Amino acid sequence: MRRFLFLSLGVLVVAFSLNGIGADHHCPWDWFSFDRFCYKVIKQRKNWQDAERFCGQLQNGSHLASIQSWAESKYVAMLLSNNAFLDTVWIGLFEPEKNRSLEWSDGSGFCYTGWERRKRNNVDNKKYCVELSWMSDYLEWNNVKCESRNIFICKI
């Protein structure tokens, strides 16, 4: 009987963690928890603006994911490695006007940067948005034209 209770408790703990319920934050059932935030990978291809709009409609207060630390970057990379299937993925970093500084769509500040080794470029004077690529194990940022169609990750 004791073994059955222990096994049942273990299954319950695993079920809660798979449903995105972390010890420090409660997320919607199909979102994943890290620190005090929730994340969801969306496997639909959209341009950056449509992806940002989709996140906001999906859950109140949701935006494309901002990445504020190395630990958060590693967590997002792990989620994408398990769910993105060798795709490029939009995050919430964008250039609101040509040749301006980048901003996070959720309004958060810059605490961390993860630019790819070849660094940020804007050679053709167009607006850019930022993606993560499987080629860098989803750890390095790359700016591309916002009209590109990628899958994306939302954060609340």
Curated annotation (Swiss-Prot):
Keywords: Calcium, Disulfide bond, Glycoprotein, Lectin, Metal-binding, Secreted, Signal. A motif (Sugar-binding) lies at residues 119-121. Residues 34-155 form the C-type lectin domain. GO terms for cellular component: extracellular region. InterPro entries: C-type_lectin-like, C-type_lectin-like/link_sf, C-type_lectin/snaclec_domain, C-type_lectin_CS, CTDL_fold. One of its GO terms (molecular function) is metal ion binding. Residues 1-23 form the signal peptide. Glycans are attached at residues 60, 99. Pfam families: Lectin_C. Its main location: secreted. The keyword ATP-binding does not apply. It is found in: Secreted. Disulfide bonds join 27-38, 55-154, 129-146. Expressed by the venom gland. Ca(2+) binds at residue 142. Belongs to the true venom lectin family. Lectin which recognizes specific carbohydrate structures and agglutinates a variety of animal cells by binding to cell-surface glycoproteins and glycolipids. May be a calcium-dependent lectin. This is C-type lectin lectoxin-Lei1. It comes from Leioheterodon madagascariensis.
